Design a protein with these regions (language model features):
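Membrane-proximal helix-turn-helix segments that form the acceptor-binding/catalytic region
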Residues: 24, 100, 118, 125-130, ...
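Acceptor-binding helix/loop patch of EC 2.4 sugar-transfer enzymes
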Residues: 12, 76-83, 130-166
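Conserved donor-binding/catalytic core segment of Leloir-type glycosyltransferases
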Residues: 203, 215-243, 256
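Carbohydrate-associated surface elements
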Residues: 41, 181, 199-202
């Protein structure tokens, strides 16, 4: 890349939602690139539009010198499979419409493939129409994640998904993966000659001098999970395993779950009010060092 070039980031989530792509955008901007973002109105993880934002068809705002183009977001997807399905389709359609009008002005397109691969279609539209260099940074692998969310693997669905995934990955010029294990999963779908770039997620630069938070009144061994509380995280197995511990060990231990997501209500019911399993909810990123140091 050359400085002063224009980069469009296509992503389902962006500030004020907390993901690594926020840091990437600011880093490129600080290096002299002109960075714009095409995304949705912010709703993650609660499925509701953040206070101070409106859910219009097309809106503009700005984050520390990065221009943001936002399109309408589906809300209420945490509690409805139908709405979750519409959520997958929504950005694919509205984002692609906007991409047709703004795509020509950019030198590079960078797709932050956080979840659904359908969210990367606006990037592919720009590639097809304007032949711009286009890269995906893959955080979640399709079609595997579709089945992991509970969709039954039928011959028809498998055929459709395989064709879609292959179409998407045959219309990019570069691909980065956040886990080396993704390479074998994606290899059947990428075009010949396309090399994998390994770009793992990194640890936050936290203030480790912060005083640890008191996670319990009594001295205990603390086990802590922090992140998205969804179905694919398989936290039910962790809770079930913790509940199988003898009472003596449980009283000396505490399982802390930090975060929010679509599976939170189910996991709270599963814990059955176990006093040694504590759900702390979503916490600020800058406060996480206090939890880590106490664990």
């Amino acid at each position: 890349m050359t400085k002063n070039k224009k980069i469009l980031i296509v992503t389902e989530c962006f500030y004020p939602e907390e993901f690594k792509i926020n840091d990437v955008a600011l880093s490129w901007k600080d290096k002299g690139y002109h960075v714009d973002v095409l995304t949705l109105a912010p709703t993650y993880p609660l499925g509701k539009v953040f206070p101070g934002y409106k859910n219009g068809f097309f809106r503009k705002d700005e984050y520390q010198g990065v221009n943001i183009f936002r399109v309408h977001a589906v809300t209420g997807y945490r509690d409805s499979t139908v709405k979750k399905t519409f959520k997958y389709i929504n950005f694919m359609i509205f984002g692609s419409i906007v991409a047709i009008f703004i795509g020509r002005r950019y030198d590079y397109v960078f797709g932050f493939n956080l979840g659904s691969l359908t969210d990367m279609l606006p990037a592919v539209v720009i590639r097809k129409l304007y032949k711009k260099p286009t890269m995906f940074w893959v955080q979640d692998v399709w079609p595997d994640s579709v089945y992991a969310y509970g969709f039954k693997k039928t011959k028809m669905l498998s055929t459709l998904l395989d064709a879609f995934v292959k179409f998407m990955h045959h219309n990019i010029t570069a691909v980065a993966i956040s886990s080396k294990g993704f390479e074998s999963k994606l290899e059947p779908y990428i075009k010949k000659g396309l090399k994998f770039n390994y770009a793992p997620n990194w640890a936050d630069d936290l203030d480790m001098d912060m005083v640890p938070i008191a996670l319990s009144k009594n001295q205990k061994i603390h086990f802590t999970f922090a992140g998205n509380v969804g179905k694919v995280q398989n936290l039910e197995n962790i809770i079930n395993a913790f509940c199988l511990l003898p009472d003596g060990y449980q009283k000396k231990s505490q399982l802390n779950i930090i975060g929010d997501g679509s599976n939170l209500i189910f996991l709270k019911k599963l814990s059955n009010n176990n006093p040694n399993i504590i759900f702390h909810g979503k916490q600020k990123r800058e406060d996480m060092a206090k939890f880590y140091k106490a664990s």
